[in-house]
């Protein structure tokens, strides 16, 4: 199988409640793709036996481990929030490990010759420097009112929690400036899907 030099490496980002998971589900169903969620990859690179795991235990102590010897996410988060200086150190351990994992699988996908789209989803893709790595950065947009309604309905978030999370993320303007393509996901999903297909219709490998 020849490497697929036409494979697109796409970063999928957007604010909380924008509907990134629905967009990714559609892409997964209709295109020959591999999709990686940064949160899931971060979990994998922190499993026992990895270099990332060893570094985190050395930094934070064995008290972050559960009875099975794995990192307890809540305990680790509580420890980090209690000492903000630890957050930067943890990010400096985890983010490079995630990036290395993704780039290894990117090359494997390209060499397979069978993958058309290699997609990576994360809220912090732009902040963590993926803009210089991806072929295209896609911003999944939905207005704040729509996002807040979704978060209340699907996750039971309070207004205070929603505002706190939104305030910690990039602004709409910052997302747009760093992206090649914007999908307006404020309305019906069918319209969002149409935007995706129109964007990708120029590629001859589309099914």
Where are these regions (language model features)?
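ATP-dependent small-molecule kinase phosphotransfer cores
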Residues: 43-114
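Walker A/P-loop
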Residues: 21
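Short beta-strand-centered segment that lines the nucleotide-binding/catalytic pocket of NTP-utilizing
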Residues: 33-46
């Amino acid at each position: 199988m020849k490497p697929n030099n036409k494979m697109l490496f796409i970063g999928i980002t957007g604010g909380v409640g924008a509907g990134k998971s629905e967009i990714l589900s559609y892409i997964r169903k209709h295109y020959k793709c591999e999709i990686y969620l940064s949160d899931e990859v971060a979990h994998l690179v922190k499993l026992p036996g990895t270099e990332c795991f060893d570094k985190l235990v050395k930094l934070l102590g064995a008290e972050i481990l559960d009875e099975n010897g794995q990192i307890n996410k809540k305990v680790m988060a509580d420890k980090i929030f209690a000492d903000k200086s630890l957050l930067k150190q943890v990010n400096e351990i985890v983010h490079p490990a995630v990036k290395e994992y993704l780039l290894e699988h990117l090359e494997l996908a390209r060499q397979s010759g069978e993958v058309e789209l290699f997609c990576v989803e994360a809220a912090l893709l732009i902040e963590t420097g993926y803009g210089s790595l991806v072929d295209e950065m896609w911003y999944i947009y939905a207005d704040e009112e729509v996002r807040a309604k979704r978060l209340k309905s699907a996750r039971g978030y309070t207004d205070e929690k929603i505002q706190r999370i939104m305030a910690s993320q990039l602004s709409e303007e910052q997302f747009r400036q760093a992206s090649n393509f914007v999908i307006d996901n404020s309305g019906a999903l069918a319209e969002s899907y149409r935007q995706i297909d129109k964007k990708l219709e120029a590629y001859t490998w589309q099914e």
